[in-house]
């Protein structure tokens, strides 16, 4: 059985083109690539100011301009994307421990260590299988630093 994602999943950005945000095929749930675009504000997450204060503090906001301006964009986008994956998996009836595979696309591979720190917050136990790829660019603009696809094993109940 294959079903499309609900069109009105709260807080989940709709795709930028004609494709499903996620699909279920039997016990598997496949998420399309998720980028750091805030659907409520119609804007790209560019730093700590674009995510909740609690999240910014958790992922490493220091309050020092030179540190925050350098690491803030990738840390904030990483948190935002992984939180959207969490929300989507929960909307499908699962939890992050159901995620079995991630494919991570980076504009700059040197961002991987910062992303990895954030990913550990969402996967504190055994991490999912993972593929990391560097790409030259992502839609819709050059401000997008990361895109993540997820696959979850979520048996039908």
Locations of the language-model features?
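N-terminal presequence-like segments and the immediate start of the first folded domain
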Residues: 1-83, 87-101, 106-157
């Amino acid at each position: 059985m294959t079903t499309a994602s609900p069109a009105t999943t709260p807080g989940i950005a709709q795709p930028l083109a004609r494709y499903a945000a996620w699909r279920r095929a039997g016990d598997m749930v496949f998420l399309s690539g998720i980028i750091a675009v805030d659907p409520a504000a119609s804007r790209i997450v560019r730093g700590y100011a674009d995510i909740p204060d609690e999240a910014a503090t958790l992922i490493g906001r220091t309050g020092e301009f030179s540190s925050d301006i350098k690491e803030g964009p990738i840390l904030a986008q990483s948190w935002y994307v992984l939180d959207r994956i969490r929300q989507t998996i929960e909307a499908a009836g699962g939890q992050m421990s159901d995620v079995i595979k991630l494919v991570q696309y980076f504009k700059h591979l040197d961002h991987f260590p910062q992303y990895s720190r954030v990913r550990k917050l969402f996967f504190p136990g055994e991490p999912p299988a993972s593929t990391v790829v560097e790409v030259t660019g992502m839609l819709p603009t050059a401000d997008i630093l990361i895109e993540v696809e997820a696959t979850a094993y979520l048996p039908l109940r």
